[in-house]
Each structure stands twice: as structure tokens, then as C-alpha cells.
Amino acid sequence: MDMTSAFTLNVRLDNVAVVSIDVPGEKMNTLKAEFATQVRAILKQIRENKALRGVVFISAKPDNFIAGADINMIGNCKSAQEAETLARQGQQIMAEIQALSVPVVAAIHGACLGGGLEMALACHRRICTDDAKTVLGLPEVQLGLLPGSGGTQRLPRLVGVSTALDMILTGKQLRPKQALRVGLVDEVVPHAILLEAAVELAIKGRSAQRNLPVRERILAGPLGRTLLFRMVSKKTGQKTQGNYPATERILEVIETGLAQGSSSGYDAEARAFGELAMTPQSQALRNIFFASTEVKKDPGSDAQPGPLASVGVLGGGLMGGGIAYVTACKGGLSVRIKDINAKGINHALKYSWDQLETKVRRRHIKAGERDKQLALISGSTDYRGFSHRDLVIEAVFEDLALKQQMVAEVEQNCAPHTIFASNTSSLPIGDIAANAARPEQVIGLHFFSPVEKMPLVEVIPHATTSAQTIATTVKLAKKQGKTPIVVSDKAGFYVNRILAPYINEAIRLLTEGERVEAIDAALVKFGFPVGPIQLLDEVGIDTGTKIIPVLEAAYGERFSAPANVVASILNDDRKGRKNGRGFYLYGVKGRKSKKQVDPAIYRLIGTQGQSRLSAQQMAERCVMLMLNEAARCFDEKVIRSARDGDIGAVFGIGFPPFLGGPFRYMDTLGAGEVVAVLQRLATQYGDRFTPCERLLRMAERGERFWNSGETDLKE
């Protein structure tokens, strides 16, 4: 074989053929169309060697099997027919693997996703390592697609239809023990013996067909299948609001295969894959994937990062506890927490304990691994143990004098190279650094709550922050498993600045008489994961509205919230979910009582709660203000590119991913249409909808935020 081949065949002395997968020059193995010739040549050799007792497919990469198909192949397709042909080519290769007369085993270590799992499904048996890096899944739905190389047909027959639907409709990834439990793999072994165990499995021969659990057998029958698909279709529709066509096609294709046979199923799969590849939703989701991949590679600045072995955290509250957890347990860094009392330290330690104990209970990690990770975290009520910290993150109250005091204390008690990162959500970083002896080592690092779940962080340098400080902070964020965007030190930074007008408009709709649940439902239908009123309840009404006066002082009336409404709600001791009452009422913690709108909220703000506007009208008002503010942020260089703006909105506030982010969405609409809608709304509802100068200029020139092949509009 050519040395540049991604697939290499070696026949062992025991007459088992080992096919090593190693895409040249790439960290991850991905399947490309041009590999078809290589694979076919190897399969031909296998068929011609009558002495072979079995075949093992294994990766030569240290931490992945096959991470999926190369998504660029789909982008290169100019029509649904081309994408369908691509799927049929993949199906044919998998069919040839399955048709081999000798037993074929997939030996899996690391990520086995998408086309990688489809290849493993085409093998007769599967074995994987018990390593934390090993995950198996079909995540195509997250790109607006479905598995196109036979996955929709083979998976239901292997693990049962309900398990397969759950995996394919959500894109969820199974850990080794889960994969074994559902029958996706035959064995789970230590990494050190993977190859030998796979060879042994190949020599044993093909296993008898696994008996599915009784429940799965019932659901595979005509009556059970009809009921299952009806129920899943209804549930999926409620979740996607019809915004993701891939989910409907997945259900249709799997049901076709089960009802009419796999041949019809493969045809339906390839056809649906081709059609979905051309949808705007898939294109937008793939753009988000590429943009997030680019952001994760972006070092933040041209400088080399400084040392980063240990981190300090000031404050053991909710944010401090979450930051300590992701730094130690995801980043693997030593963490020292300082709080004014032992209660705060214990709270932060318990936060990590609870997170890790949940993982132990779910058998994601062992107790020994939990203890090892917890050992990275310690605490103190003074600065003992801080002298060698490379970076200190403060997560104390939003009080400028207090944060300036923290800077002074860190400079006094830590090393000269220690970086001070503030988790402020509203205070200017330049003000926090105003009295610093080393202002070049002060930076903002804005996390979102809950820290362990929210993927985005904003990295905020002020005017004199050094390039090395930026690079080191970005490196830390990546270690914590976050997606960092670098934003300017202006009031509200980026995410809160575009979120505030959206929330304010929702409150205005409420004061005009619209119902809470109708406003939330309108924005969920538009594509947000939760509505704006519910979001305010989840964040905490006191916390979520704290930034409004800051933004109003910086940018004027367009950021003013409806007079007295917020004050009335806060004065009535309504903080949202955290104290059980906000716009909604919440049941006792631990009980499964649903949240309900509190009718008293209408009396409190002096309205009747009767809907007048359509869902589309309500969504338009909230979203157009967000788009207008995003365009201003782009113009003022608050964000470095449209790419960062889209990632910030999708990962930070749940802007509908199928629209690609605010800038992709504005490009889809066209600047002229965005301006026309804003001008119409300004005439109806006031000056806050007046389109910004950037949008007016772009509409006049016919410009876009994303230029072909570029990350943003070039000046």
C-alpha cells in the first residue's frame, strides 16, 4: 500500500488481518470520499486471501477510532443528487465490509462517531476500551443531517428501535458500559489488550444474533411500532417546534426500513441525506460547527501563553464553586479557593463533590477517580497557598471597590507573573484595573451560569492588558472545556449587551397585556431553548436586571426597562426559581410539580394578561432588537468578527443554532430586509427600533457580515 494511505493491511501469523486506520497529517481520523478506493483495494485483498480467519479494524491514532465523516464533503456537494450519491457510496462500502465471509471486528478506542460508528456497525462484532475517551454515537442530527451510510438501518436492528431512535434523534454519545448494556458492543476491555482481545473475538467467529429485550421486541412489531413512532413524533415535534427537518426525516427513514425492509430503508436514507444536506438549517448548523472549531483553535493573541499549572479562585459561592470545579475536574489544574469564612470554602468543595458523586452514581467514573480529582481542590480563609498561583479568578460580589481591593491583595500575596481575571458581568475591566500595580495582568473572564453546563466564556482585555495575559487566559478557558471569545471592554461586553434589549422587549410585551406563557411560547417557537421571561426566572430576576441601569447609563434610553415594572416585581420578593416565585411559581424542590404562571403577576404590573399579538409579531419585536444591537457591537468592534458574534449568541444565550447565529441570520434575511423591518417597528413602537448606522450602510451597499470564505466583513 501507498505510505500516504489512510488504511493499511497487515496479516498476522495467526492469519488475522489487521486494518490500521491512520489519516496522514491529521490528529483525528475522519472518512473522506477519496478513501473509497483505498478501502476497496484492502477488501479485495481480504476476499482473495482464503487463509484468513478474521479481520480487525483498529485505529493507529492514540485517542480516536474514527471521529466521523469529513463534513467538507457535504459542503462541496452542489445538489441533493450529489449528496445522495455520496451517501450511496458510503452505504456501498459498508455493505462490502458486512458481506466479507470471515468475521470482522471493530476494535474501538476513543471517539467512534458518525461514519465511524456506521463502519463499526457494518462489522460483525464490536469491542471497545473502558477508557473515558471512548464514546460511541451518531451525532449527524446536530448538523441537520441523518446517518447516511446505513446507520439508520443497522442500529435499530442491533440495539432495538427505541434505543436507536433515542441515539439518532438526539445525537447522544454512549460511554463504554452504556454501549455494552444496550448491545452496541460485545465486550469492553482495557486499552492495553484491545488488539489481542479483538483478534480473539475474530477467531471465535460471528456471534449468534443477540436477543433484544422483550420491550424492544414488542416495539419492533407493527402495533408497538405504530404507537412508538406516533409518541416519539409528537414528543420530538414539541421539542423542535418544526425548526429541525432532520428529526422528521429520521423517523420516516427508520420506520420505512422496519416496515418495508432494509433495501427500501437504505434508499430512503440516501435520498433523505441528499435532501437534508441542501436545507438552510443544515448549512447553518454546519457553519456553527466550523466556526466553533475555528474558535477553539484561536489562541486569542499572537503572544505565547505564560505558565499555567495552578489557579486561585476568590469566592466560594455558586460561580466560584462552578469555576473551581471546571478548572480542577475538567482542566486538571490545582485549585486553591479563598473565601472570607469556612462556610464559603465548604460550599465550593461540596459543589465539586456533588458533581463528581453524580458521575460515580451514574457509573461514568469510579470513586477513585472522584477522589483524585477532588484532591486537586483546597481552600483557605487567607492567602496561604496562593504565592505560586499562575492565575487568580475572582468571583465576588459586583462591587467595584471590593474587586479593586481583590486586585491589590492578589498583587501583594501572589507571584509577580500572576494574572488577575475578574468574573464580572457588568463592571468595566479598566475600572477594576485602575489602581493596579500591574494592570497589564488584569483581564475579564466572564462565565455564564451554571458554569459546568454553559459552554461559552467571554475573555475581556482592557486597554493595557498584555497579549500574553490574553493568550494565557484563553488557554485556561480551553482547558476548562469552554469556548472562549475575546470581546472589548465596553458596558455589557457582548452577550449581556445583545440579551438585554431582547429581555426588555419581552417585559414591555407583558406590560402591554400579553400573557407570560404566550411570550415565552413565541420565542421557543422561533427557536430559543426557553422563552425570555422563563430565562429571567432561571437566571434570577435580581441578577438578570442588575445590568440594565449600567447599560442605560452607557448607551441611553434604548436600554431602559419599562418604568417601575422590574422594581414592583423585586419589591414583591420575586427572584425566580431560586426562591420559588418569579413570573412563574415553582413547586417544592425535589417534587415533580410543573411551574405555573403566577396570576398575581398581572395585578402586580397592572395588566389583564390577554394576548393581542401573534407569536410571530412578539418574536419579531424581541429578536430584531437583539439583531440591531449585535450589528452595533460588530461596528464598535466589541467582537472581533461575525464568527465570534454568532458563536457568542448561540453558545451564550441559545440563539437558534439552525439560523446560524445573529450575523448569519441577518445575511440570510439581507441587510435591506433587516432595515425595512426595523423601520416598520420604529414607526409602530418607537425609536428603540431605529436601525443602526452600520445596517443602513450595509443595506445601501448590499453588503454582508460574512463574506464568502471570510470570517467577517472587511472594512
From Swiss-Prot:
Region (Enoyl-CoA hydratase): 1-190
Primary localization class, coarse: cytoplasm
Organism of provenance: Citrobacter koseri (strain ATCC BAA-895 / CDC 4225-83 / SGSC4696)
Family annotation (InterPro entries): 3-OHacyl-CoA_DH_CS, 3-OHacyl-CoA_DH_NAD-bd, 3HC_DH_C, 6-PGluconate_DH-like_C_sf, ClpP/crotonase-like_dom_sf, Enoyl-CoA_hydra/iso, FA_oxidation_alpha_subunit, FadJ
Annotated pathway: Lipid metabolism; fatty acid beta-oxidation
Subcellular location: Cytoplasm
SUPFAM superfamilies associated with the record: 6-phosphogluconate dehydrogenase C-terminal domain-like (SSF48179), ClpP/crotonase (SSF52096), NAD(P)-binding Rossmann-fold domains (SSF51735)
Protein name: Fatty acid oxidation complex subunit alpha
